[in-house]
């Protein structure tokens, strides 16, 4: 090798076994390699001279050269060559057309380095081994993939090439620490000026190469669809390292070709950076961290699980020029409540009057002193809670603060009183509830008005079900109206998030008049179908101006349902006989009498409903939960497209808001509340204990 002619250069001696025959087995090669460990010194220091730096292996330690080296001098070669394995002698420019045959034991050596003759330097095209994979750079030139098992000898070859290109040099003694066991310090015959010039040329070459760009989580497939702003990509710089210093580098894994949007870090130690602006982890190239948007994930804990202690640092790279920054991206406005700012005091609101008092709390009409806006203030009942915050109110706050839909009442914030037991929810003010409006009306809603209200109600329920939430207490008193014709769903005290597969829940949900038959019969595995049954009851109540099934107990409620819709059986409702309450004997009713309540043409002034409208009502009140219509299918029903068309919100009837005195003396025919039923059963004050106790 050329390094031998400039005394003082001695490379590492690595035993490499050559395959002399194509048919020699791998075991024979390993046996021969074990018996002759001193043969075939490493004379391939000039192999792959024109390739860029890659990952190198020496004595079990991986070393990385962060930059390419200048191409070596091409030599004419003759003769035939054989197949090459990783680590074998190669000649020429290091391209796939060059190689060397195995060395013989009797060949001369200089300074411990075996020299290869020109006749032995060329390989036969027929026996040339195909090298893969092939990497194409930006200029269209083909480069061979880096060999991950090459040792530190490539670094020696870099210095050897510098010496080979100079005619006069200044001897420089570089005492380097040995890399691994069995290696001694190297004596380098290098010109200081040449090394500095080589580093400058290499930095220029690095700037001409294409580098992968950094990218944050906002541009990944997990980002919001509304975040369509143009993200700025900041290219990551490399730190130039001399060939001698690269020997002492720590290990790092080889980076494969990046996919679009993949974050690559070319640092010499395994580290990761955490952007303080976006809270997104940007790890090393062999890590693939994906943070799903919307999940409450502790970034610090996620990082500690994947990286050892001391490796999660803010921009933990070598030098300021190696620091990668995640640019700030403007996000679209979203539903977000900053709880860290603290809650406002209830004293910042002026009380006007009391709106309603129910099972879950008292509702006041107040004015915000800061903005002058009229809002509703709902006080959470805490006197019966001994173990902390009420679970029903906690669920309601959690759901309403995370939802934003025109058909769902908006919770603006949570405020506190003088002590920790006075908790209030600030909600948008709605003048009426649907039940109170219907009781003040002299005539029921027309079909066009019912269509307008049902469309808004179905859109809100569809939004809940699409977000895996069951309301479980839909009724006319939980539907709010304003004088602009808008309907909003409220009172999420019994709502629950559900998943797949379904989990068993309590059957004591939904106010009795709007409770689905599977709940009345004791089913604990239920889904969105229970809300759709409630919508059917509400639709019938809107058309008739009265409750559809006004039972006084669970048995009475089932009896009224069966008398109207017919008694179910296994043919109508598969699985009916397996329900706990199916053992109770009810009167046999074979016909569906629902049509008798809603005539297509009425001469007596009763509620009218077209054939399409009756079909929708009948599908909402289907016994089998699996066959009951969904909110999405109900929105696409033909009843909403036939005449008369749904009335516009602006033309819906308006009513004056009731004052506190009118509400106090107003007697509502209220249906039993599910929570009151449970309390009465626990206290043993309910004479009719229903089907289950």
Swiss-Prot record:
The modification Phosphothreonine is found at residues 359, 506. InterPro entries: CDK (IPR050108), CDK11/PITSLRE_STKc (IPR045267), Kinase-like_dom_sf (IPR011009), Prot_kinase_dom (IPR000719), Ser/Thr_kinase_AS (IPR008271). It comes from the Eukaryota. Its EC number is 2.7.11.22, 2.7.11.23. ATP binds at residues 355-363, 378. The modification Phosphotyrosine is found at residue 360. Residues 13-24, 40-54, 75-87, 97-122, 287-296, 670-682 have a biased composition (Basic and acidic residues). Keywords: ATP-binding, Kinase, Nucleotide-binding, Phosphoprotein, Serine/threonine-protein kinase, Transferase. Residues 26-39 have a biased composition (Basic residues). PROSITE patterns: PROTEIN_KINASE_DOM (PS50011), PROTEIN_KINASE_ST (PS00108). One of its GO terms (molecular function) is ATP binding. Residues 1-148, 236-330, 660-693 are annotated as: Disordered. Residues 349-640 form the Protein kinase domain. It catalyses: L-seryl-[protein] + ATP = O-phospho-L-seryl-[protein] + ADP + H(+); L-threonyl-[protein] + ATP = O-phospho-L-threonyl-[protein] + ADP + H(+); [DNA-directed RNA polymerase] + ATP = phospho-[DNA-directed RNA polymerase] + ADP + H(+). One of its GO terms (cellular component) is nucleus. The active site is at 473 (proton acceptor). Induction: By cytokinin. Residues 1-10 have a biased composition (Gly residues). It is an enzyme of class 2 (transferase). Residues 268-284 have a biased composition (Low complexity). This is Cyclin-dependent kinase G-1.
């Amino acid at each position: 090798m050329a390094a031998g002619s400039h005394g003082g250069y001695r490379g590492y001696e690595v035993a490499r076994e050559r395959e002399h025959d194509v048919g020699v087995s791998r075991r024979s090669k390993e046996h021969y390699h074990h018996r002759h460990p001193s043969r075939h010194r490493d004379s391939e220091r000039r192999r792959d001279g024109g390739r860029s730096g890659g990952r190198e292996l020496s004595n079990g330690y991986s070393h990385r050269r962060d930059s390419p080296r200048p191409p070596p001098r091409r030599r004419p070669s003759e003769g035939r060559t054989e197949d090459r394995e990783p680590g074998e002698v190669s000649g020429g420019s290091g391209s796939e057309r060059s190689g060397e045959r195995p060395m013989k034991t009797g060949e001369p050596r200089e300074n411990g380095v075996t020299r290869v003759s020109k006749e032995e330097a060329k390989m036969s095209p027929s026996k040339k081994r195909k090298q893969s994979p092939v990497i194409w750079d930006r200029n269209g030139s083909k480069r061979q993939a880096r060999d991950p098992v090459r040792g530190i000898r490539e670094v020696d070859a870099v210095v050897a090439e510098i010496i080979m290109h100079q005619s006069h040099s200044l001897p420089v003694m570089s005492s380097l620490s040995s890399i691994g066991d069995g290696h001694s310090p190297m004596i380098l015959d290098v010109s200081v000026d040449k090394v500095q010039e080589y580093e400058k040329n290499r930095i220029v070459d690095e700037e001409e190469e294409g580098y992968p760009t950094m990218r944050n989580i906002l541009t990944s497939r997990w980002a919001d669809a509304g975040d369509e702003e143009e993200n700025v990509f900041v290219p990551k710089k490399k730190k130039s390292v001399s060939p001698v210093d690269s020997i002492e580098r720590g290990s790092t894994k080889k980076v494969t070709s990046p996919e679009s949007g993949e974050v690559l870090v070319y640092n010499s130690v395994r580290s990761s950076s955490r952007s303080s602006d976006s809270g997104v982890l940007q790890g090393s190239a062999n890590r693939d961290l994906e943070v799903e948007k919307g999940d409450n994930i502790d970034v610090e804990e996620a990082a500690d699980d994947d990286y050892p202690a001391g490796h999660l640092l803010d921009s933990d790279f070598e030098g300021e020029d190696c620091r990668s920054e995640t640019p700030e991206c403007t996000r679209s406005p979203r539903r977000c409540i900053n709880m860290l700012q603290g809650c406002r005091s209830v004293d910042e609101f002026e009380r006007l009057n009391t709106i309603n008092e129910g099972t879950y709390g008292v509702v006041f009409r107040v004015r915000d002193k800061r903005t002058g806006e009229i809002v509703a203030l709902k006080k959470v009942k805490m006197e019966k809670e001994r173990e902390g915050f009420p679970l029903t109110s906690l669920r309601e706050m959690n759901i309403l603060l995370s939802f934003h839909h025109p058909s769902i009442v908006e919770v603006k914030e949570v405020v506190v009183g003088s002590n920790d037991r006075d908790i209030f929810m600030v909600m948008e003010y709605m003048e009426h509830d649907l039940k109170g409006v219907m009781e003040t009306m002299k005539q029921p809603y027309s079909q066009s008005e019912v269509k307008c209200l049902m469309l808004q109600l179905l859109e809100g329920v569809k939004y809940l079900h699409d977000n895996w939430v069951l309301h479980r207490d839909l009724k006319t008193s939980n539907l709010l109206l304003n004088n602009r014709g808008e309907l909003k769903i409220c009172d999420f005290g019994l709502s629950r998030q559900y998943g797949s597969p379904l989990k068993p829940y309590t059957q004591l949900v939904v106010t009795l008049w709007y409770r689905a038959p599977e709940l009345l019969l004791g089913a604990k595995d239920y889904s969105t179908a229970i809300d759709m049954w409630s919508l059917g009851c509400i639709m019938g109540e809107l058309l008739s101006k009265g409750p559809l099934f006004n039972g006084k107990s669970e048995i009475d409620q089932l009896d009224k349902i069966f008398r109207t819709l017919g008694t179910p059986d296994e043919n109508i409702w598969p699985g009916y006989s397996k329900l706990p309450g199916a053992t109770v004997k009810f009167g046999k009713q074979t016909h569906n009498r629902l049509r008798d309540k809603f005539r297509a043409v009425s001469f007596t002034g009763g509620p009218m409903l077209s054939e399409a409208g009756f079909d929708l009502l009948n599908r909402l009140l289907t016994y089998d939960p699996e066959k009951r219509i969904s909110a999405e299918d109900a929105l696409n029903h033909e009843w909403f497209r036939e005449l008369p068309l749904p009335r516009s919100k602006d033309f819906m009837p308006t009513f004056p808001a009731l004052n506190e005195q009118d509400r106090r003396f107003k007697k509502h025919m209220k249906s039993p509340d599910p929570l009151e039923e449970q309390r009465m059963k626990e206290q043993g004050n309910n004479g009719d204990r229903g089907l289950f106790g």
